[in-house]
Structures are given as C-alpha cells and as structure tokens.
Amino acid sequence: LQQGDMTDHNIDKEWAVAASTLNMMDDKVPYAFVMGNHDLGKNSNKRDSQLFNNYFPYAKYSKMKNFGGAFEEGKMDNVWYTFKAAGIKWLILCLEFGPRNNVLDWAGEVVKKHPHHKVIINTHAYMYSDDTRMGEGDRWLPQKYGLGKDTGENAVNNGEQMWDKLVSKYPNILFVFSGHVLNGGVGTLVSTGEQGNKVYQMLANFQDGVKGTNRGQTGFLRIVDIDVKKKQVKVDTYSPYLKEYKTDAKNRFSFEGVDLK
C-alpha cells in the first residue's frame, strides 16, 4: 500500500519513474496507491489528476481480478479492491488527498455493501505526528491548500473529519494507513468506533523533510504482520535499500487482542 506523493512536482519525468517502479510488481506483488498533494496541480490548487491517470490508467487497473470499483468510472483517484488472506475477506479503500464529502459518502456506501469484509483505508493525509488525527491547528491540513477552498459536496476533509463522517461509523473498518505529515513522520492511534470496534490508525512517512531522512533516500517501508490465531498485529519498519530495521518503539510495535473475525 502506497500513501501518495509519488512525485514531487507532478511532472512527466517524475511520473515515468513512479510508474516504471510500481509496474515492476505487476503480476508479482499486489499493490494499491493513492495521490498525495504533490501529485496534484501546482500547490494542490486544484484536483488535477490528469498525469496520475495517464501513468496509472483505469483501463489497466480495472481489469485486475481484485479491482472492485471507482468513485468516478475511468479515473483511479478513488477506488476499492477486495482480496482474501488467512481466511479473512479484506476490502481496501484508496482515497484521495483531503477526500471530498461526496467521496466519503461513496466510500461509506461501499463499506455498507461489504459487511463481512475487514476494511483497510489507504489515504494520504489522516494521522498527525503526535499520535492524533489531523485536525484544527495542525500543519499541512488539506484545508490549507488551494483545493481546500471548495465547498458543499466538494469540501475537503482532514483526519478528524474523516473519523467523524466515515471511519468511526462502520464496525468492520479495522485499519487506516496514511503519510503526508513531516516532523517525525510517524504516529499511531487506536480508537473505538461508534459500535465498540477498535480501529488501528498509523502514520508512516519517510520522504524528504522528515527528521532523520536523507532527502528521502532511505527506502523505509512498513511491514504489517497479522497473526489470526494470536489476534496480534505486528508492525516493523524496514529498508531493503539500507538493509536495516528501525527498532525504536514508534517504528516497531504490536497490537494485541485484535478482532479479526
């Protein structure tokens, strides 16, 4: 799962690198991705996803066996997938940077139609680096970008608003993964939804600008290991580029007693 900012300036040569990299996993490793603010128009002043959709075309990904559907047919901006692993049916929702109200409404309908799937939400901006959801007063809020001026059904949502309007409402939403935020670039939060279910929310961002990175050239990623019998989720942070793990408590941890039924 990739959380966006595949490019820095939303230009062809950067998209070509991003596409060629992810394409190496075709027919080998299933993958899903979202757009970050850097992947949109200049300074995210509008939802310009033309280059994103040129390099990651709907015609290709909609033919994959796990593809479920899209908010807008013909565009990869907001899509969902299903798969089965360890006897569990999973649904992945890939949501745009600062999901609009109408996108959250659509996502809720998708979740409602799949009550027996465990849901993973993959999005660019949701958690903050202080182990809370992004909300009023935080830096890098979607509302602070050009597209944040939209209103009505196109109004954007930060992490706290996403929790209120979508994440907290459905008992089968289990994980939310996000990036975007700098500072330390990591954050973890376990919250209880409206129906008593636990939701495990994580920020993991290793791009340029995060403390401890070297212009982003560290190649770190998260490995999430789910043990159904033990009801345990273990999280490791590893760089195949550096061949090393991050072993501090913010990058190596586990959740116990996870409801995986």
Q: Where does each model-flagged region fall?
A:
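Short acidic, glycine-rich surface-loop motifs adjacent to enzyme active sites
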Residues: H114-D138
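N-terminal active-site segment of His-dependent metallophosphoesterases
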Residues: L1-E14, R139-P142, K261
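Hydrophobic/aromatic residues located in beta-strands of well-ordered beta-sheets
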Residues: Y31-F33, V119, V176, Q201, ...
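Conserved beta-sheet core of the metallophosphoesterase superfamily
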Residues: G146, T151-V228
